[in-house]
Amino acid sequence: IESHGLRWSVVESLPVCEAVKYGGAERDRLIENYKNSLANLGRCGIKTVCYNFMPVIDWIRTDLQHPWADGTTSLYFDRTRFAYFDLHILERPGAEKDYPDPLLAKVEEMGKVISEKEKNDLIETIIVKTQGFVNGNIKEGDENPVKIFKKLLSHYEGIDRAALRENMRYFLSAIMPVCETFGINMCVHPDDPPFQVLGLPRIVTDEVDIAWILLSL
């Protein structure tokens, strides 16, 4: 790429393993692997590394090719469709408490007309395609992606914002010496969308969260 006047200086992303986020027994080993990856990137001249600390599910979309009137398409997030996925496909216990009554009414109406193909498309879009692209926990061809996804969610039972913040602080404290050695800036991707989903805590949603990250080390 340098022969074409370009320079490779940014990596997006270097994914953080789930066990690091929920504080699993193997997190120290995984953090060491992460530090080695950072060092290797640093030796290649990389100065900016993007990452995120979103539990289980990365950026969320309900449609990867939403059509618009001018003939273009884009990624799209429809909260009603996502709520339907949460309530009637995942069947997450207590999920109804996370949505206002008007939205629940829309979900009920949607349930009367949604086709099996549309349900499968939601599973493919929210679980398989997005997550397979981001971190490979779930991939095309997996027999029961919903079951796998539920198991991933189960690791976060009892993990609240405070616990997730502490796990993020632990991770950043461990990797910063490597970043300083190679002059690497860590660039955190904000939670997308910036609010709690699927009962999971989100800790990079606004300026208060960003201030906490900058002051936590």
Language model segments and positions:
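Acidic (Asp/Glu)-rich catalytic clusters
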Residues: 1-9, 39-45, 176-183, 213-217
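Glycine-rich anion/phosphate-binding loops
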Residues: 22-40, 163-171
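Hydrophobic, ordered structural segments
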Residues: 46-47, 54
